[in-house]
Amino acid sequence: MAKELRFNSDARARLEQGVNALADAVKVTLGPKGRNAILEKLTGPPTITNDGVTIAREIQLRDPFANMGAQLVKEVAMKTNGVVGDGTTTATVLAQAMVREGLAAVEAGANPMRVRRGIERTVPVVVESLRSHSVEVGSSSDLRRIAALAASDDEAIGDVIAAAVEHVGKTGVVTTEESDTLGMAVDVVDGIEFDHGYTSGYMVTDPERMEAVLDNPLILLTNKKISQVQEIMPTLEVAKRADRPLVVIAEDVDGPALQLLVGGNMHKTMQSVVVRAPGFGHRRVAELEDLAVALGGHVIAKDTGIDLGEVAREHLGSCDRLTATESDTTIVGPRGHQNLVDARVAQLEVQRERARIDADRDILDLRIARLTGRVAVIRVGGATSVELKERMLRVEDALAATRAALEAGIVSGGGTALAQAHRVLDAVELVGDEAIGRDVVRRALSEPLRWIAFNAGFEGGDVVDVVADLPLGHGFNALTGEYGDMFEEGIIDPFKVTRAALESAASIAALLITTETAVVEEILGQPGAIMAPGFGDLAEGMVRPSNIY
């Protein structure tokens, strides 16, 4: 198949067009006075949001070269969202600034590889500076402010999330659900979470959030690999007779067995989801036994003497609700006997006291927390479906920011921490084109503050100049238009979010700066159609593969 190519400055310019198109659409949402974007949906009402990653997901450009640039910046937003769940707009703004400054330096004759090396050597210095100035979350008011700021300064969301986190503590789990009411409420229920998710995307029940949510399921627990239909059929028959969905938590499910389960979901004859069992090696059976006690079931394994062909109803666990994503699983309302759970926790606490290795103690702490933890469910409502979706996105952003703050502390917010981080760069001794890479980072650090001020109706450049000379931690309050101590005014950002945004942006910018060739499929026939050997013009008007994220 023929390809279309662009080289050198032409390739970089076309890629930069895509970077700018996506970043310009996203950065207007930055800050407490950021604007909204309205996104068309082919079915249902449009979505109104100021969530950076949600906007980025919707952007595809007609020019395939520019579209590649847009998709790379989309990767910045997606990666940041995947790591911390917030900070996507900041990451996009930083990436655009680094690409702009870096490409300008390359076009002026700088060696792109040395510029890249300068960026890669500078960013860790900035991260360590931010880490050294971060402080632990000290009170519920800090949690409330972090959540409110991440939700576009919505105090109601801040109050709800702070209440949820206080209920469950640092080791607890907080989830969100849509509600039929107009407001928001917090329900605290018994629950368990572990870090493995579903094995097949065909089993999701909510394609928009890519989650599989099953109410009142039966749960099979096994450390075996299931491949054959006859191995899973007895369990399926039990679930079918009970008219309940099935969750399979196993080492792996593949082959005909997986095809049978996926087919049941696709034809809506049997709802099920396969989740990879937690733990590794010899610890897997132990962690499955923890789940069996909590869920009121049994582990199907050689050690227990129960075979997959002998599974009956009493061998299966159950719960009120199970939610699985690609990376983790949350079980709400496990139905095991509390006296057995208490006995299991006591047994694990004895093992922890006898453990001599820190790693073993950490794993036992996690298992104890999993069995004793609670789950807070934030129920979010709205007057219309559009308002509900917009509020859900802000609640999820705020929840992610709060978790990040609890995990790694907070820094001064409103773009202040990044804008003042340039002070440590004078000590970074680089020469030649590597020094240019350092200056690329230096100039990009002030870009989030510039756009926060601009979106609030102020001259961004003037604000950046003033904040650069203020004492450390003092910055610009975009709501009042005044300068002050960011911590005292409650304008704070999670360190983990700020770090993830900077590192993701620098990674993509360094790749774009060193690009010399861009290759896309040649457009033939109708715009958007592609040619395939032996098939001719495929699906006239079909979206190009390069446009699909």
UniProtKB/Swiss-Prot annotation:
Gene3D superfamilies: GroEL (3.50.7.10), GroEL-like equatorial domain (1.10.560.10), TCP-1-like chaperonin intermediate domain (3.30.260.10). Plays an essential role in the productive folding of MimA and MimC, and thus in the formation of the active MimABCD complex. GO terms for cellular component: cytoplasm. It is found in: Cytoplasm. This is Chaperonin-like protein MimG. Keywords: Chaperone, Cytoplasm. PANTHER family: 60 KDA HEAT SHOCK PROTEIN, MITOCHONDRIAL. Its main location: cytoplasm. Belongs to the chaperonin (HSP60) family. The keyword Oxidoreductase does not apply. SUPFAM superfamilies: GroEL apical domain-like, GroEL equatorial domain-like, GroEL-intermediate domain like. The keyword Chaperone applies. One of its GO terms (molecular function) is ATP-dependent protein folding chaperone. One of its GO terms (biological process) is protein refolding.
